């Protein structure tokens, strides 16, 4: 019994350290995000009216104010284009999204990217900084880079969460 308690205690300490080691990037070249991105995988702890978890990103545009504009493609009966504005904050890797249908604001935080192949982001509820969802986007449909980094980030989500694996045939192709 003592051995079991010791094992559980050590596992918890390891999990806490793993969570602390995953931070968002310190700097971000937002101009390098311009272009198309495809949703590879997403995980969320709740349902959102934010379409970001069901869509490919047709374009990422940089506004003159330094904000990001996402042009999204949602697949319903057909592919429909929608726009979402991410307002810059004091932190270079974080943007604010206000969703009027939810009367809520979220922080869009870029966790990891190599700019050429993949980027990982998480959404936080602004009021309590609780991580609500994370997603893995890639530049090319067949790309899988960033998968290990995404799995590490998933370990930081509150339980339970739902993982959505995207099939390329279900995507709106840009």
UniProtKB/Swiss-Prot annotation:
Keyword set includes Metal-binding: no
Annotated compartments: Secreted
Name this polypeptide is given: Beta-lactoglobulin
Signal sequence segment: 1-18
Physiological role: Lactoglobulin is the primary component of whey, it binds retinol and is probably involved in the transport of that molecule.
InterPro entries xrefs: Calycin, Lipocalin, Lipocln_cytosolic_FA-bd_dom
Similarity comment: Belongs to the calycin superfamily. Lipocalin family.
Phylogenetic lineage: Eukaryota, Metazoa, Chordata, Craniata, Vertebrata
Source organism per UniProt: Notamacropus eugenii (Tammar wallaby)
Protein's UniProt keywords contain Magnesium: no
Coiled-coil annotated residue ranges, if any: none
GO CC annotations on file: extracellular region
Subunit structure as annotated in this protein's UniProt entry: Monomer.
Entry GO MF terms: retinol binding
Entry keywords, A to Z: Disulfide bond, Milk protein, Retinol-binding, Secreted, Signal, Transport
Domain of life: Eukaryota
Disulfide bonds: 79-172, 122-134
